[in-house]
Amino acid sequence: MSSIGAGAGGAVVGAAVAAVAVGGGAPPHVLAVDDSSVDRAVIAGILRSSRFRVTAVDSGKRALELLGSEPNVSMIITDYWMPEMTGYELLKKVKESSKLKKIPVVIMSSENVPTRISRCLEEGAEDFLVKPVRPSDVSRLFSRVLP
């Protein structure tokens, strides 16, 4: 895995989030879901260095539990392959929920499988990122997905 630093992409996102905070809004709250503690720490670190508020959980089941008690999540970034519930299954549950369906969901995977990517996008994923996720990926997501 490559070393991730707060490069130019992270600075752009940080500036954009700081502008939101100066305007009186709270930083966007991102729910990061990954069963790998290493990958979870990497994505959470990138998001936090860009001044996002991050909650990181290790499963789709825990993500749904958290969303049930705190639906004010700005975006969900989830791994595709996880035990018990895949990121694809989490995506479907979020999009089927009248309370949660407007939350943008981004799927991540270490595998670049075109049919999987297409299926996730057709089910309503905002984007599909191939790991390792970089600060520039987060910058692009912020400018495109979050208002």
UniProtKB/Swiss-Prot annotation:
Gene it is expressed from: RR11
Pfam family for this entry, one: Response_reg
Descriptive protein name: Two-component response regulator ORR11
Modified residues (4-aspartylphosphate): 79
Organism: Oryza sativa subsp. japonica
Function according to Swiss-Prot or TrEMBL: Functions as a response regulator involved in His-to-Asp phosphorelay signal transduction system. Phosphorylation of the Asp residue in the receiver domain activates the ability of the protein to promote the transcription of target genes. Type-A response regulators seem to act as negative regulators of the cytokinin signaling.
Keyword Transcription regulation assigned: yes
Family: Belongs to the ARR family. Type-A subfamily.
The keyword Transcription is annotated on this UniProt entry: yes
Description of post-translational modifications: Two-component system major event consists of a His-to-Asp phosphorelay between a sensor histidine kinase (HK) and a response regulator (RR). In plants, the His-to-Asp phosphorelay involves an additional intermediate named Histidine-containing phosphotransfer protein (HPt). This multistep phosphorelay consists of a His-Asp-His-Asp sequential transfer of a phosphate group between first a His and an Asp of the HK protein, followed by the transfer to a conserved His of the HPt protein and finally the transfer to an Asp in the receiver domain of the RR protein.
Alphabetical list of InterPro entries matching this protein: ARR-like (IPR045279), CheY-like_superfamily (IPR011006), Sig_transdc_resp-reg_receiver (IPR001789)
Gene Ontology BP annotations: cytokinin-activated signaling pathway; phosphorelay signal transduction system
Source taxon at top rank: Eukaryota
Ranges for domain Response regulatory: 29-146
SMART domains from the UniProt entry: REC
Taxonomic lineage of the native organism: Eukaryota, Viridiplantae, Streptophyta, Embryophyta, Tracheophyta
Disruption phenotype: Dwarf, narrow leaf and low tillering phenotypes.
Upregulating conditions: By cytokinin in shoots.
Keyword terms: Cytokinin signaling pathway, Phosphoprotein, Transcription, Transcription regulation, Two-component regulatory system
